[in-house]
């Protein structure tokens, strides 16, 4: 946890031909109903909504392919859409939409961060979200072929990490596999490797390196500590029971346990289980599955485990009961947490497969699992990783952080646990009354921007992911609670509708490279889907983003 530029930069933790000819049947596309948000870098659409295209007897994905090819000049996209856009996900939702997610490729190679989503209802394409990288077919840099191997790329990344980050060779954890991609930065396109370096010592990190596959140049690097990947979980075979214990703040709560000689913090009632471990002040994870002799967890040493276990369950319940989502991956992944990590450690994070909580040093933090919004914030990073996949850098990273703050707060209200619009207030600076890490109602209170004109444009904090999240946090607060901000009045619509709108935006409209403007369009479209285009909900979303200067 660090203070920089008088701002709290706190990380909790989070780019040939058709095999079969496509026949363009008669269609109607009402151009006058199209609403377009433009990507300023490429001058191409990043969000289009309206009655875009209807072709009788055509599959939803074929509608997308036809629309993109029909508008090739608008997208500056002259490749075969069916060959280039790889369908990764397709499902029907409870509003009657068919939702699809596509990965852009170039000659079969995925383009880093280039994902688009599409919606079809009653045979009509209604929305296309995400930026297609234009003119890749003209890039001579993509025609030479790779010259480096995966191992050579990883060696380059590891050498730089030791020299400039860790100063010693870390003990690497299992990370994501190295991936061969097309990487685009401005007008430059490169064949590249994405190398993931995940480690716990000397300080936890989950670095992503983009290495040029031709000359070995480091094209980009950033720490994405909150990215999630399920890990293997060994469960105890026993009898489900209910224990009782006291949390970090002294409150008593019942917790689900499993009995097999001892009582273990293993909750079998939710998905594939919730497991809480004791790291015993070490940095080896996960540690030992927490065991107790009498199912009574009242010792002070027990308190962080009680809260980590209980609040993971509350967060699971929120996503299931409110959004019909089963765990962070939507498929009931087991949730693992380790407490008593290291000594005096002032942080909490996902290491890529589980939650990790430090005990704090007693001055900056007390045990971080004592904050329900902290727990839900971190688990929401995992939800984001399995849906929008927001890249943890610049505006997409700030959206990533804001989404975690928003749902961390909504879970706190769901649990009715002294809820407020502050982040981390229960565990931060115990000696300072009323202090918190960030404020959603008043980001400027802690030096964070509350308007796009005040955004941070430097390189610290991965391009301001924790700083600029304040802009989106303020918009979310206004959508829920209403108010007047910079002369713009917003009618509040309440927390429940805020949650529904942002959950739909996150899971169906946002893409890895989404910026604030695309988020606005995604939120407006989500409100339109849920409540209708002329509703107060849509008006309030527009008002809130106007109030924080996001167009």
Swiss-Prot record:
For the ligand (Ca(2+) 4), the binding residues are 429, 432, 435
Q: Which UniProt keywords apply?
A: Calcium, Hydrolase, Metal-binding, Metalloprotease, Protease, Secreted, Signal, Zinc, Zymogen
The active site consists of 378, 466 (proton donor)
Catalytic activity line of the entry: Preferential cleavage: Xaa-|-Leu > Xaa-|-Phe
Q: Do you know what upregulates this one? A: Is expressed in the stationary phase. Up-regulated by NprA.
Of which family is this protein a member?
Belongs to the peptidase M4 family.
From the Swiss-Prot or TrEMBL record, give the protein name: Thermolysin
Query: Which gene name belongs to this protein?
Result: nprS
Prodomain residues: 32-235
Per the UniProt entry, the signal peptide is 1-31
Q: Where does Ca(2+) 3 bind?
A: 412, 418, 420, 425
Q: Which residues take part in binding Ca(2+) 2?
A: 373, 412, 420, 422, 425
Q: Where does Ca(2+) 1 bind?
A: 292, 294, 296
From which source organism is this entry? Geobacillus stearothermophilus (Bacillus stearothermophilus)
EC annotation from Swiss-Prot or TrEMBL: 3.4.24.27
Give the record's GO biological process terms.
proteolysis
| KW Zinc (keyword) present | yes
Q: Report the cofactors.
A: Ca(2+); Zn(2+)
Q: Which GO terms describe its molecular function?
A: metal ion binding; metalloendopeptidase activity
State how the cofactor is bound: Binds 4 Ca(2+) ions per subunit. Binds 1 zinc ion per subunit.
Note the InterPro entries from the entry.
FTP_domain (IPR011096), PepSY (IPR025711), Peptidase_M4 (IPR023612), Peptidase_M4/M1_CTD_sf (IPR027268), Peptidase_M4_C_domain (IPR001570), Peptidase_M4_domain (IPR013856), Zinc_Metalloprotease_M4 (IPR050728)
Q: Name one GO cellular component term.
A: extracellular region
Q: Which residues bind Zn(2+)?
A: 377, 381, 401
